């Protein structure tokens, strides 16, 4: 059913104001709003441990070039800068699409070229997309960058990819220093690391690539739809679209799902890390610089098919594969 059939406030202006025109548009077909926005997760982040950086004099990178310089320094110091694993059974490859998407938002024309890429107006063969793949390949294929190399990239389960960050070698060095992954990954952390989010382990924003482009945030999230207009359905719809809905979850210590409601009380999050993530999503939605995961928006045979497969092929075959 259209949202107007079940939302007690028949005027949907309030809903559209609270959840941004971008998210509202994702749930709209032929002018009718069917999907109601709900929770969101933040993907434009890189996990790291401040104490490990500080002990070695490393600085948090704000730009791609700074991140590459840091990676080179870590390799020169005899360690691996990145954890990276994208095995996910039949969905293997999706993690690399997230890297591509973050790079796409920060190159070319930013959100404009990103949106055209999603709708196939901008082809995968376009130089903007090839450039994003080239930058991703730099992370994948530079010797020493990824713990375990490309073999580990294609064979390590994504939920275990960050584990080396939480282990130490005989010299007291972690297996890696940076792990680019969404806010939800904390639920996959090893038991010994549970409770570290926002304490021993935190995040920095995915670095800018083209400094002339405004900041953007990549994310995923949940949407819901109603299949009848019963009174009980209307009551649930009212609650789901309220700023109160996410409050109980936000106060859970390991909650990694943020409210997509721009009026949500950010002070309710369980710690400063999640609060900053929530504020980042809210600010990006208000500035129209939040974008949903591109592969999830593309037709399934592309976003959940050939795109995933080609990311695996890129990892295996190296940068020369980009022009094949």
Mark where each language-model region is.
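Short helices/loops that flank or line small-molecule/ion binding pockets
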Residues: 1, 52-53, 69-77, 157-179, ...
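Periplasmic solute-binding protein
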Residues: 23-60, 68, 85-117, 218-225, ...
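Extracytoplasmic ligand-binding clamshell segments of periplasmic binding protein
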Residues: 86-88, 109-192
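Long, aromatic- and glycine/proline-rich binding clefts that accommodate carbohydrate-like moieties
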Residues: 201, 250-315
């Amino acid at each position: 059913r259209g949202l107007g059939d079940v939302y007690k406030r028949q005027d949907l202006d309030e809903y559209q104001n609270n959840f941004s025109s971008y998210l509202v548009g994702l749930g709209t077909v032929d002018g009718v709003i069917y999907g109601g926005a709900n929770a969101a997760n933040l993907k434009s982040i890189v996990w790291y441990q401040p104490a490990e950086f500080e002990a070695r004099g490393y600085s948090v990178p704000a730009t791609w070039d700074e991140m590459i310089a840091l990676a080179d320094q870590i390799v020169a110091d005899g360690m691996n800068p990145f954890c990276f694993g994208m095995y996910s059974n039949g969905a293997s490859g999706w993690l690399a699409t997230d890297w591509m998407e973050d790079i796409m938002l920060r190159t070319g024309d930013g959100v404009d070229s990103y949106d055209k890429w999603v709708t196939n107006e901008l082809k995968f063969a376009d130089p903007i997309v090839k450039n994003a793949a080239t930058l991703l390949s730099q992370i994948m294929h530079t010797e020493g960058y990824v713990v375990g190399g490309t073999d580990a990239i294609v064979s390590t389960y994504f939920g275990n990819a960050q584990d080396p960050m939480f282990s130490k070698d005989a010299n007291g060095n972690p297996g890696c220093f940076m792990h680019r992954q969404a806010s939800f990954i904390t639920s996959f952390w090893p038991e010994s690391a549970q409770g570290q989010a926002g304490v021993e382990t935190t995040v920095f924003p995915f670095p800018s690539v083209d400094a002339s482009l405004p900041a953007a945030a990549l994310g995923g999230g949940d949407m819901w739809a109603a299949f009848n207009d019963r009174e009980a359905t209307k009551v649930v719809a009212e609650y789901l679209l309220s700023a109160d809905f996410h409050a109980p979850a936000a106060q859970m210590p390991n909650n990694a799902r943020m409210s997509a409601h721009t009026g949500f009380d950010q002070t309710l999050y369980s710690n400063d890390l999640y609060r900053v993530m929530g504020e980042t999503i809210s600010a990006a939605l208000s500035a129209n610089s939040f974008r949903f995961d591109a592969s999830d928006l593309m037709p399934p045979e592309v976003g959940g098919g050939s795109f995933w497969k080609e990311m695996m092929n890129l990892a295996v075959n190296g940068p020369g594969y980009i022009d094949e």
